[in-house]
Amino acid sequence: MASFLESKGITFETHKDHVMFEKSEVTKDDGLPYKVYTPYSRKWMAALDKEGITVFPSENHLDKLLNHHQKLLSHEDLGFEKSDVKAPQYNISTDLIEQYEARRNFPAVAGTSKLGVHLRFGTVSIRHMVSKARSTGNNIFLKELVWREFFQQILWHFPHTQTACFKPQYERIEWRNNENEFERWCNGTTGYPFVDAGMRELNATGFMHNRVRMLVGSFLCKHLLIDWRWGESYFAEKLMDYEMASNVGNWQWVAGCGVDAAPYFRIFNPTDQIKKFDKAHQYIQKWVPEFQELTYAQPIVEHKMARERCLEVYKSALK
């Protein structure tokens, strides 16, 4: 866009508003980008302490905007269509932030802010969110906002990771890419109720709890040995809070091939995850009401076998 406008003699200016710190504002001492989250977050926090949070009282300057009488383009004019899916209301109450660490991993509990879609479309200010998090003294919530900016600077400095593994040796993995199994994963009929609940929630609402995102992503890549790019593409189609940097970064994290990723031998047990995060089956019951009935799908793969197969394939590719 900048190149096009400048070629027409039109001045193009950008103003930082989507993030606290842009792609090259938080770097190592030698100016190179961070590839590991923890040192990046420390530098990010130090920069925040130094620079503080600038407030922009835009409403005080509304009288300076140009008056014109042209009809504004509607959403339909821009190619959008109405949908029955409703954007979730975000919650940034002091109570939620203070209890975030204790509640965030339980999908049946209203323990997350659901801010993603609002940050994506700019209907909430990142400065306001950071200020709110700091006022409660809860660094766990704040660090999740830092992860977002970490992944954004990674995608800027390493644009090839949009479609390629950050760790190139992982391109040697021989994915099975079974289309029937992928379809069952997409539809939430894998026979693993926690996985199925997440996919059905995604398909129905355009949202999925973060803990469940990690599980369904790991299940696709590790249990079914389906290329992470298939899952990333499906999430890009369905998620209302889709941001390329976070989506790519998190998919490569669960697949083990990304920057600062989980080790490849970390393979979630879908049944154990229920015991830890949905013991009373409240979340599962909401999205997979038939999970205890004979009509429920048989498991698409046996966990022990899938785990051993995954480890063998990964080891073979990385040796």
Which residue ranges define each predicted feature?
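Active-site neighborhoods of enzyme catalytic cores
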Residues: 1-41
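Generic detector of short, locally flexible boundary/turn motifs and exposed helical patches
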Residues: 2-4, 83-84, 92-95, 182, ...
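Glycine/tryptophan-enriched, flexible segments
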Residues: 10, 31-170, 273-319
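Short linear motifs at secondary-structure transitions and domain/linker junctions
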Residues: 10-15, 92-95, 225-229, 261
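Short amphipathic alpha-helical surface micro-motifs
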Residues: 16-20, 100-101, 233-234, 267-268
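Low-complexity, flexible helical/coil segments
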Residues: 19-26, 48-55, 73, 180-182, ...
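Active-site-proximal binding-pocket segments
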Residues: 111-287
